[in-house]
């Protein structure tokens, strides 16, 4: 096959609907963690589409440079199509064939790649698709939604759109409704702007109605009911689920989360340990265990007014060590798990291990391709570490400002603005020409809509540092709006 034909083939490949054309970037995930998770779901989560999981696993194998393993996964996907989707075999094969074509293309087996694009073209022609190599069908949109969801928070809105598109065609399809409900639940959970979001409550109820035997979707409904202060109703679902299952780690982990948030830490730990026996490499489970040990530690410290002694002090030290162990395990198993970094760093600080805390915070600050919410949280926690443990007020101010610049609407906003006002005012009492504090107050008052006060502080800062572009820009904006 000539170069021209290779270029032509590439143009056809780009038309296909499959994982290789859905803009799923490997920089946004920990490949080993996602591969591990998919493997666990294939083994233990019987309610999820095995076809979608094998197709996704093939793509992950390709991203790891394991194209032969990717082909084996696609063979597994084909077997599932024949076993479970024989009534729609050709339509359900389109994503798998697209992945085959791309893998063979990357292996320079161009004739094999062309064979699969030909199969796709024949189906599109047979079903009168307006596109030569693309067929609009809800099953493909659903599979796209699952793939996007697996690649993390940056993809949730696109996943939601994919499931919505599928539901337009089949509004009562059980699988489409599960995918949509879980995606909206994830969006509720990731949208941290103060109030509890409950957009997923309706979709979750519908998904449970359409899938009455699905424990996995029920546990999400229980957690959302807990979010909206209907904990008793949520617990009924949890109890019902636990009566029905024995060792489904993906259900146990969320049931444990329910009990952890209810402050029933021993019950949560019991379920987490049970799940961890089955899936010992789960970063989620390790993180949840760390959160339970941390909560128990906080309870003792509160009861002793932050001065535990004797047995209480020994127990606190033991809980800190346990929390560190599990947060560290979570971070090591998923290098993109931002909250595992901040929780581990904070726990090191709690135990007086400041150099270890500093090291983990610096690793967190170097994380790329994470959401703005995660960046916001990292800067906030590092600022607190600098303020209260390192006693470095200027570094704390810098990171509090960075947190607000990344995301100025969140539950942390009031804490951040209060901390900035307190620290900056204190520093100005000692040095009225402290330009960092002046500009920080200007930024905070501008954020709060106090434009005249903001302008006054920026003017003072600009007099000290007249070439600073940030101060000049802020002043111009303020003067034009006053």
UniProtKB/Swiss-Prot annotation:
Protein family per UniProt: Belongs to the IFIT family.
Site label Interaction with the 5'-triphosphate group of PPP-RNA, positions: 288
Organism whose genome encodes this protein: Homo sapiens (Human)
PROSITE patterns for the chain: TPR, TPR_REGION
TPR repeats: 51-84, 94-127, 138-173, 181-214, 249-282, 338-371, 376-410, 435-468
GO cellular component labels: actin cytoskeleton; apical part of cell; cytosol; plasma membrane; ruffle membrane
Region Interaction with the 5'-triphosphate group of PPP-RNA, residue ranges: 254-260
Positions bearing the site annotation: Interaction with PPP-RNA: 33, 37, 41, 150, 186, 250
Name used for this protein in its record: Interferon-induced protein with tetratricopeptide repeats 5
Keyword match ATP-binding: no
Keyword check for Repeat: yes
Induction description: By interferons (IFNs).
Any GO BP: innate immune response
Taxon lineage: Eukaryota, Metazoa, Chordata, Craniata, Vertebrata
Name of a matching Pfam family: TPR_12
Annotated compartments: Cell projection, Ruffle membrane
Keywords for the protein's UniProt record, in alphabetical order: Antiviral defense, Cell membrane, Cell projection, Immunity, Innate immunity, Membrane, Repeat, RNA-binding, TPR repeat, tRNA-binding
Effect the entry attributes to changing residue 150 to N/E: Inhibits RNA-binding
Role noted for this protein: Interferon-induced RNA-binding protein involved in the human innate immune response. Has a broad and adaptable RNA structure recognition important for RNA recognition specificity in antiviral defense. Binds precursor and processed tRNAs as well as poly-U-tailed tRNA fragments. Specifically binds single-stranded RNA bearing a 5'-triphosphate group (PPP-RNA), thereby acting as a sensor of viral single-stranded RNAs.
Major localization listed first in the record, in broad terms: membrane
């Amino acid at each position: 096959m000539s170069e021209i034909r290779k270029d032509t083939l590439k143009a056809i490949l780009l038309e296909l609907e499959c994982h290789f054309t859905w803009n799923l970037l490997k920089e946004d995930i920990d490949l080993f963690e996602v591969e591990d998770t998919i493997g666990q779901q294939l083994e233990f989560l019987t309610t999820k589409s095995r076809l979608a999981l094998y197709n996704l696993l093939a793509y992950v194998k390709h991203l790891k440079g394991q194209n032969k393993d990717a082909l084996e996964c696609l063979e597994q996907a084909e077997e599932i199509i024949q076993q479970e989707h024989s009534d729609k075999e050709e339509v359900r094969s389109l994503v798998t064939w697209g992945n085959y074509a791309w893998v063979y293309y990357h292996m320079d087996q161009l004739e094999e790649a062309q064979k699969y694009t030909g199969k796709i073209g024949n189906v599109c022609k047979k079903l009168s698709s307006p596109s030569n190599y693309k067929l609009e069908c809800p099953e493909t949109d659903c599979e796209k939604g699952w793939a996007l969801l697996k690649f993390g928070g940056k993809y949730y809105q696109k996943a939601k759109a994919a499931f919505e598109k599928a539901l337009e065609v089949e509004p009562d399809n059980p699988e489409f409704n599960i995918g949509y409900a879980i995606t909206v639940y994830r969006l509720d959970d990731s949208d941290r702007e103060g109030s509890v979001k409950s957009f997923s409550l309706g979709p979750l109820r519908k998904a449970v109605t359409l899938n009455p035997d699905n424990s996995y979707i029920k546990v999400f409904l229980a957690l959302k009911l807990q979010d909206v202060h209907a904990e008793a109703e949520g617990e009924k679902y949890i109890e019902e689920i636990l009566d029905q299952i024995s060792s489904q780690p993906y259900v146990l982990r969320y049931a444990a989360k329910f009990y952890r948030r209810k402050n029933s830490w021993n019950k949560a730990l019991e379920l987490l340990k049970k799940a961890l026996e089955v899936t010992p490499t789960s970063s989620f489970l390790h993180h949840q265990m760390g959160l339970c040990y941390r909560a128990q530690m906080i309870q003792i410290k509160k009861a002793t007014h932050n001065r535990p002694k004797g047995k209480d002090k020994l127990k606190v030290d033991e809980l800190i060590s346990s929390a560190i162990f599990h947060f560290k395990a979570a971070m090591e198993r998923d290098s993109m798990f931002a909250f595992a970094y901040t929780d581990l760093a904070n726990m090191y600080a709690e135990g007086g291990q400041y150099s270890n805390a500093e090291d983990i915070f610096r690793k967190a600050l170097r994380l790329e391709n994470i959401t703005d919410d995660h960046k916001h949280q990292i800067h906030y926690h590092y600022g607190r570490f600098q303020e209260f443990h390192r006693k470095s007020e200027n570094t704390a101010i810098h990171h509090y400002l960075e947190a607000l610049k990344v995301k100025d609407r969140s539950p942390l906003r009031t804490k951040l603005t209060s901390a900035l006002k307190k620290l900056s005012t204190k520093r100005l009492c000692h040095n009225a020409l402290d330009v960092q504090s002046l500009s920080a107050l200007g930024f905070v008052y501008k954020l709060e809509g106090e434009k005249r006060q903001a302008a006054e502080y920026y003017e003072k800062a600009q007099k000290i540092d007249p070439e600073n572009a940030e101060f000049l820009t802020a002043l111009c904006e303020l003067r034009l709006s006053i």
